[in-house]
């Protein structure tokens, strides 16, 4: 099973590139983006992933404007052997220059959602620490992720109108990850799976001359499973980005978070993040949400278009809904990203706070799987 990439000296195992190093059914390789206006007036998300042992390639595009509906396109197909084929029906991703420039195209389709967008990097790529989570003796997540901050140009069309996207006001994050994590239909057979939960925060923020980033995975008592904070230079143009990686990145000694929730929900009304450097100096960043995006619009916990679920040789679909009217405690609605204003007392920024909290979480007073804040 050879493909074009086998002509390059990039192999990490004796197998061809199409053969993952693990036989775990949940192996995946994902490309993901967000984009948002610097005034919080809109947000869009993009995702595509291949699941080699499920033989599936799926994708999604979703957009919401302030005060409007969230519009979604979903696509799924049998995975191509050729890994450079990053297309699902009317949707495709074109890597124009690796680690610098990417084009995302969604041609006209029955969902009424389409786009032609180009992402241009403003930072080098930033590798997060390896993320490994366990359920009993089983490793249920083992992934590498890197992020890159940039700007967007292009156009988005949806059933309620058209958005011109320009790099003078549209920021965004590219997120590449690969490894193993739970996807697709629930597994059957064997002993019943012990109940588990998840607490996750992800906060990429853009400031005048730098970015900050914080990642958290917590256990049910608030114990730290993953903690990472990063500060890195932000460049004026793509041409200024020094290379694949930037030696000026600063890794924090640790990070802390405090989230205040809207009563009766698990949706943040405000949050604070502490970045603690190796000299013990703490930078506290306050976050104010201004726009909500439901991550089910990209397939996360979606009951019909969940990631890694077999839909057929090639299927596409779409939907529109008002994110202000969904039940915030339904399992499919708990995972969100919010566009947030950020300030640290001296500087102001803009960015995103991603959040998912399912199951008991003592620091916030959650005692059940889907109870809301008091």
Regions flagged by a language model, labelled:
Residues 1-374:
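Structured soluble/peripheral alpha/beta segments that form catalytic or ligand/cofactor-binding pockets
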